[in-house]
Amino acid sequence: MKIAFLFRTSPHGTSISREGLDAILAATAFCEPNDIGIFFIDDGVLNLIDNQQPEIIQQKDFIRTFKLLDLYDVEQRFICTASLQKFKLDNRELILSCEKIDRSLLLEKLNQAGKLFTF
């Protein structure tokens, strides 16, 4: 993979995660889908929880936009197993399917990327 996008922060309160998603969508215009890898670790896994209500805290609901990754054929998506366990989440609660991997394998894959963008 040439470009890796790492999500480490929660989705609301700042625009960091939304900007990360925008960066991924922009990258799909210039890269082949298999050149892009997306990783969720720590608070970043919270970006994938379905049925969030950010309008309650006057935030924009961008979470559903993650579903566009299927449309753009971005299939290299990984989520940290330990982070899921920390928040007691399972696949049924997530808006996007990702391959569950342990932290060490996730970090190994990140090290193989040509460029790394962290959000």
From Swiss-Prot:
Q: Name one Pfam family in it.
A: DsrE
- Keyword field contains Cytoplasm: yes
Ribonucleoprotein as a keyword?
A: no
- Cellular localisation: Cytoplasm
Q: Which residues form a coiled coil?
A: none
- What Gene Ontology terms describe where this protein resides (cellular component)? cytoplasm
Chain segments annotated as transmembrane = none
- Keywords assigned by UniProt, alphabetized: Cytoplasm
Family per record: Belongs to the DsrF/TusC family.
Annotated protein name in UniProt? Protein TusC homolog
Q: What is the lineage of its organism?
A: Bacteria, Pseudomonadati, Pseudomonadota, Gammaproteobacteria, Pasteurellales
Q: Which gene encodes it?
A: tusC
